[in-house]
């Protein structure tokens, strides 16, 4: 039986495909639906499509070159490879040190030292008979990998330094005469300057109350607000200096102005002093309505107060607070009252008239002269704040000042209430670091006035956030010359700086000059300024010269 063979079932049939003809270019005219959502990126066969697994190298280097496996042919990055760290397997690990039993502590210490050849007595090791090792805190300070060294070495600059403002704006018509840098001034010396000779003494002093020597942290006393007038009179407005300038001396100033110049190498903030040369006489003045008489706070600190005027801890608000505290403390520690004895100098207070009925602070004025050589005779007004009655009956004159604590955490200092009674030396050392210029000025003023004692009070805020209420935590007294030695204050260098500036001015022609501390550099500049500079305020007042000494401060009513 014959079978019929179906050739169509054995062999596949061929269907002619439909080819689209693209008249405008090459390629299909329409995109099939199956390839419509597939992304496309131009590529080259030479591009690396991935990275082989490498377990030997660390992944830190790949962070810097994350795109080195990206396609270099096209601009897209759909198929680029990125090496990312998988944080899903991240776990916290307890790194707390396991406390070893006492018998296992230091078990292999000697063995390790002996192997390395740097044991206690080995060369380069620790010598038990020599210098003691530094503590961990000091080692960090010395190690360049810690603190500031790391920033300078590895490029971490930190915050930019603060740019302080100048005490006075330098005008275009001022001519710069001389620049004196601090390294040069520190090397100056004028030895063998004798004690000043009294010319005139004025004012009335009250006696010191010794009960304040028994105040401590546990027996603190509130600081009172004393309603008394303090005169802050500049040199040329002083009627006594005007009278003495006709017969005695050729250089005239006040103790505050002299202390600012003599301690200039310790200052960081800007200040200025006006100098007038008339013939062979030189008058050193402060400008009116300035902050010259305000006491700085933490001027020499590593972290000075922030420049935020709205805060009570800004430099200006702290200066007003410190001046307020200093005035009230110097008057509170005295025996006040009509029945209490007083020490009167030869002349009365030159800044008040007999018909005035005002409460004046206890201040004694000494007008003294010094021979500085080369026919230079200095005449200055110095001040005492109080007097102390000794068992022998001889009075001892005192310079009374106050240090204030505002916020130990912000000031990077020690807490007085914890350390003042037990470690007073540490508290004073911290104040010497933070207020080196202010303490040096007080010491120079006490030495110039010839005070027998420098009394320092420690005044703190009741609450660090309340700058209006304070308490007295203790007192401490020093002899001015001994205290100058303790704080490394050389009076020979101080006299040398003053003499250097006097010699520079003496070489100039008659006129008005200004010396100013640069706000951001350890430099003092001497300017030649026009004669009418700073005279606009005085001419507007229309007051005579006799009324110039009426500038006063009443700190009890100042708002701080």
Swiss-Prot record:
GO terms for biological process: cap-dependent translational initiation; formation of cytoplasmic translation initiation complex; regulation of translational initiation. GO terms for molecular function: mRNA cap binding; translation initiation factor activity. Residues 100-121, 147-156 have a biased composition (Basic residues). GO terms for cellular component: eukaryotic 43S preinitiation complex; eukaryotic 48S preinitiation complex; eukaryotic translation initiation factor 3 complex; nucleus. Residues 291-305 are annotated as: RNA gate. The modification Phosphothreonine is found at residue 128. The keyword RNA-binding applies. It is found in: Cytoplasm. InterPro entries: eIF3d (IPR007783). Keywords: Cytoplasm, Initiation factor, Phosphoprotein, Protein biosynthesis, RNA-binding. It comes from the Eukaryota. Residues 98-166 are annotated as: Disordered. Belongs to the eIF-3 subunit D family. Component of the eukaryotic translation initiation factor 3 (eIF-3) complex. The eIF-3 complex interacts with pix. The RNA gate region regulates mRNA cap recognition to prevent promiscuous mRNA-binding before assembly of eif3d into the full eukaryotic translation initiation factor 3 (eIF-3) complex. mRNA cap-binding component of the eukaryotic translation initiation factor 3 (eIF-3) complex, which is involved in protein synthesis of a specialized repertoire of mRNAs and, together with other initiation factors, stimulates binding of mRNA and methionyl-tRNAi to the 40S ribosome. The eIF-3 complex specifically targets and initiates translation of a subset of mRNAs involved in cell proliferation. In the eIF-3 complex, eif3d specifically recognizes and binds the 7-methylguanosine cap of a subset of mRNAs. This is Eukaryotic translation initiation factor 3 subunit D-1. It comes from Drosophila sechellia (Fruit fly).
């Amino acid at each position: 039986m014959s079978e019929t063979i179906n050739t169509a079932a054995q062999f596949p049939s061929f269907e002619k495909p439909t080819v689209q003809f693209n008249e405008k270019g090459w390629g299909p005219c329409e995109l099939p639906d199956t390839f419509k959502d597939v992304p496309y990126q131009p590529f080259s066969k030479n591009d690396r499509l991935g990275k082989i697994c490498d377990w030997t190298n660390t992944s830190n280097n790949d962070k810097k070159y994350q795109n080195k496996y990206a396609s270099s042919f096209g601009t897209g990055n759909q198929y680029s490879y990125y090496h990312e760290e998988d944080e899903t397997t991240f776990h916290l690990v307890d790194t707390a040190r396991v406390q070893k039993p006492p018998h296992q502590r230091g078990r292999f210490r000697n063995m390790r030292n002996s192997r390395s050849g740097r044991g206690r007595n080995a060369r380069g090791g620790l010598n038990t008979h020599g210098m003691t090792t530094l503590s961990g805190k000091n080692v960090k300070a010395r190690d360049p990998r810690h603190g500031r060294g790391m920033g300078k070495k590895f490029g971490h600059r930190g915050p930019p330094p603060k740019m302080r403002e100048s005490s006075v704006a330098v005008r275009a018509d001022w001519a710069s005469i001389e620049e004196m840098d601090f390294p040069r001034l520190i090397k100056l010396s004028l030895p063998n300057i004798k004690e000043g000779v009294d010319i005139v003494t004025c004012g009335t002093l009250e006696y010191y109350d010794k009960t304040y020597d028994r105040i401590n942290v546990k027996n603190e006393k509130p600081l009172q607000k004393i309603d008394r007038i303090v005169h802050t009179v500049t040199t040329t407005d002083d009627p006594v200096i005007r009278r003495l300038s006709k017969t005695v001396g050729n250089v005239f100033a006040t103790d505050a102005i002299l202390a600012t110049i003599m301690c200039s190498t310790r200052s960081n903030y800007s200040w200025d002093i006006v100098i007038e040369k008339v013939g062979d006489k030189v008058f050193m003045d402060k400008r009116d309505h300035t902050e010259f008489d305000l006491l700085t706070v933490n001027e020499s600190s590593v972290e000075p107060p922030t420049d935020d005027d709205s805060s009570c801890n800004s430099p200006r608000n702290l200066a007003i607070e410190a001046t307020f505290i200093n005035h009230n403390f110097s008057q509170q520690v005295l025996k006040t009252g009509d029945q209490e004895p007083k020490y009167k100098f030869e002349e009365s207070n030159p800044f008040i008239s007999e018909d005035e009925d005002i409460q004046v602070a206890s201040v004694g004025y000494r007008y003294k002269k010094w021979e500085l050589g080369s026919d230079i005779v200095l005449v200055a007004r110095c001040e005492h704040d109080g007097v102390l009655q000794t068992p022998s009956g001889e009075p001892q004159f005192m310079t009374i000042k106050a240090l204030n604590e505002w916020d130990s955490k912000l000031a990077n200092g020690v807490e007085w209430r914890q350390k003042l009674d037990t470690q007073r030396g540490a508290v004073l050392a911290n104040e010497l670091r933070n207020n080196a210029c202010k303490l040096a000025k007080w010491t120079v003023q006490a030495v110039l006035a010839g005070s027998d004692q420098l009394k320092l009070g420690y005044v703190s805020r009741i609450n660090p956030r309340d700058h209006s209420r304070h308490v007295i935590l203790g007192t401490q007294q020093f002899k001015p010359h001994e205290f100058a030695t303790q704080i490394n204050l050389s009076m020979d260098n101080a006299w040398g700086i003053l003499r250097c500036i006097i010699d520079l001015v003496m070489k100039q022609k008659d006129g008005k000059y200004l010396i100013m501390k640069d706000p951001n550099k350890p430099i003092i500049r001497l300017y030649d300024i026009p004669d009418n500079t700073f005279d606009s305020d005085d001419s507007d007042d229309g007051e005579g010269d006799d009324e110039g000494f009426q500038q006063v401060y009443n700190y009890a009513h100042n708002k701080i």
